[in-house]
A protein has these predicted regions:
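Membrane-anchoring alpha-helices and their flanking helix-loop junctions
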Residues: 1-79, 91-151
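Extended, alpha-helix-rich binding/interface surfaces that flank or overlap catalytic cores
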Residues: 87
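Solvent-exposed interhelical
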Residues: 82
Length: 151
């Protein structure tokens, strides 16, 4: 099988996490701060997250590799946002969760970024790293040494 074998499609993982966090928000609310400040933070993140994800998507397409983790990696991508983080798309999805917490002015919703990051780490990222190491060898290991996993 020429793919990393991630546990699920990452945007689906984010969606399930976001829905659960909103359901919890409907039961328990723990405000972060004044709503105006939260709204401003949420707006910044809701612009930043898709911008980061789209930049990563364009960079992967330009490199000629597949984007969906169930398909084989065809190239090692080091340009665009991949110069600063090895996982810009997962970082963007985590930022969306934080944005949701700010929009709802809810600490609990915001803190749902923790289980999301843990699921991404163990269910997606570590699997992708093993796969990319096996597929690309030393060039990928060098990239891992030079660029952080998250930020």
């Amino acid at each position: 099988m020429d793919n990393p074998g991630v546990i699920a499609f990452p945007p689906l993982i984010w969606l399930v996490n976001a829905v659960i966090s909103v359901l919890v928000h409907l039961l328990i609310r723990l405000p972060i701060m004044r709503y105006g400040i939260c709204l401003a933070c949420g707006i910044v993140l809701i612009v930043l997250a898709p911008t980061l994800a789209l930049s990563a998507l364009r960079t992967m397409k330009a490199a000629g590799t597949n984007v969906h983790p169930s398909e084989p990696a065809l190239a090692l991508v080091r340009g665009g946002p991949f110069r600063f983080t090895r996982n810009p798309m997962y970082l963007a999805l985590c930022l969306l969760q934080v944005a949701l917490g700010f929009f709802l002015n809810d600490s609990i919703t915001l803190l749902f970024v923790v289980p999301l990051a843990v699921i991404f780490h163990y269910g997606v990222i570590l699997r992708e790293e093993r796969y990319l190491t096996a597929k690309f060898g030393e060039p990928y290991l060098q990239y891992k040494r030079e660029v952080r996993r998250w930020i």
